[in-house]
Amino acid sequence: MNEDLGVFNKEFKEIINVGDAFDLLIEDNKDILEQLQEEIGFNYVRMINVFSPDMGIFPGSKFFNWTRAYDIFEYVESLNLKPLIILNFKNFSDYEILAILTSFLEYFNDVEGLNFKNFKFQFDTKIKKDLSHEIKIILEDQYNLEVLDNCYHLFDYTNSIYDTAYMLPYIIHNSIYNLSSLYYIKAFDTLDKQVNLTNEVFFGYPGLVNSKGIKKPSYYAYYLLNMLGNTLVSIDKGFIVTKSHSEYQILLYSFNESFNNLLNFKNVDKIKKTQNVTNKLSINILNIKSNTRIIEYDINEKSGSSFDYWISMGKPKRLKKEEKEILHKSSFPKINFRYSKKSTVLNIQATLKGYSAKLIILKET
């Protein structure tokens, strides 16, 4: 391969979900979001329940206190993120909703220290059509603010598969092909909605990082995607090749035609039956004009997957300090270095087993 296919659009970096806005007042969650922003870098942070008692907004109130909302938006802006606010309202009348929104808009339009024009909005699927129409007119016509065309489906389901290495190829494949919305993926796990817990480590919440601050395989799907270049060189099922300056990036991931449906199983044991697929790939890179340093990042069920390490520990319901430290330190892709002398054709071969991903970076020296 030696021809470019155009710009590689990293749309997966546009939005990161955090769930309840109130969760961004919790220091552990803020630490996770800061690391996500540092290592991946998103554009918007989508939050729900901005207009709720947790945020100091109560049904029947004649005055609305926006202190918590301001603190959150100020923090978000400090991370070079912009707020995407879901317009969902619980236990408020239509009259109250309009009063709340009017107060919100007047307050943040006048307040100093925030770029209010960067705010975006999106309707909850449950909001009344006539009410949403009225709100949209206020936001767009009176304040010149953007409202997304599609509505947001509030998602609070759990699925044990979200914790597993299966999410590596699933997220990568759907991200590079823009096949399905990953709107349910969140920055971090939260405990407040979990009723039938069996442990405090992994409980099937769709966060990239669990409640102990341990990164899941899904985190590294985005981590590896973000290391891709901005120019698309080649793409097919199971791999994508990009480049930037004097560097090529080859991201390989395990692929089979049915794996996109496996989330419907909601059971780790069932997806184990499909994981014995082996993917072999061979890619030729042409016209490398100098010696090449090769860096490989590998993550799979046997290497780098916090969930599988936890299983190997015997699925402890609660982590001891030492166990937590082990999971923190070991949950990272395995890194290998190689060196290749100048050649007309550089052949890259790789074998992927089970649910896995491999990023190969070629740097001209």
Residue ranges and their predicted role:
Residues I240-S258:
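Hard-cation-handling environments
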Residues I15, V45, V76, F104, ...:
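Conserved, mostly hydrophobic/aromatic
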Residues N256-T365:
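C-terminal beta-sandwich/jelly-roll accessory domains of carbohydrate-active enzymes
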Residues S132-T231, Q275-V277, N287-K289:
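Catalytic-core region of carbohydrate-active enzymes that cleave or remodel glycosidic bonds
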Residues I26-D31, K62-D71, I97-Y107, D130-I138, ...:
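Well-ordered, non-membrane alpha-helical segments in soluble/globular domains
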Residues M1-N43, M47, P59, T67-R68, ...:
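Mature N-terminal, pre-catalytic/accessory segment of carbohydrate-active enzymes
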